[in-house]
């Protein structure tokens, strides 16, 4: 990814950039991630669409893992978990927060999840 390979972009800035679409979606109660919506009906999707949805999530996981590895190497992040495991936690928590926020109309849910995740990087 260009952001993780660009030495002028900090890992924290890349992570904040990653959060932006989630925050944009979370500002209203009527939007969620399209792939999260499709994943909810994954088995009913045609095989080609299943592959694309899986690719979307796998690309996001790989990108987050790159950001976390970069941040750890540069001393921006301090965590003991495997970067791959944290990437899964981030994607799962962000996607879940969008869905729960939509159902509960609690629009602080996503911001609370993002704060909790970023605090995790300082442990």
Features from the language model and the residues they span:
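Structural signal for well-ordered, non-membrane alpha-helices
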Residues: 1, 23, 61, 65-69, ...
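Short amphipathic alpha-helical interaction patches enriched in hydrophobic/aromatic residues
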Residues: 1-4, 43, 98-101
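Hydrophobic alpha-helical connector segments
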Residues: 2-31, 83-90
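Amphipathic alpha-helical segments used for helix-helix packing
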Residues: 13-14, 28-48
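Conserved protein kinase catalytic domain
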Residues: 19, 36-39, 114, 118
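Amphipathic alpha-helical interaction elements
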Residues: 24-27, 41, 99-102
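Hydrophobic/aromatic-rich alpha-helical bundle segments in the mid-to-C-terminal region
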Residues: 48-59, 72-118
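Generic C-terminal helix-cap and adjacent flexible tail
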Residues: 119-123
């Amino acid at each position: 990814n260009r952001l993780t390979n660009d030495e002028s972009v900090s890992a924290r800035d890349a992570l904040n950039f990653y959060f932006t679409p989630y925050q944009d979606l979370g500002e209203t109660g009527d939007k969620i991630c399209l792939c999260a919506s499709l994943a909810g009906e994954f088995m009913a999707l045609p095989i080609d669409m299943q592959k694309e949805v899986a690719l979307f999530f796998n690309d996001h996981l790989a990108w987050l893992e790159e950001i976390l590895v970069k941040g750890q190497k540069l001393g921006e992040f301090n965590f003991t978990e495997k970067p791959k495991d944290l990437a899964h936690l981030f994607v799962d928590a962000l996607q879940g927060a969008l869905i729960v926020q939509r159902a509960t109309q609690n629009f602080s849910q996503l911001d609370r999840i993002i704060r909790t995740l970023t605090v995790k990087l300082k442990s």
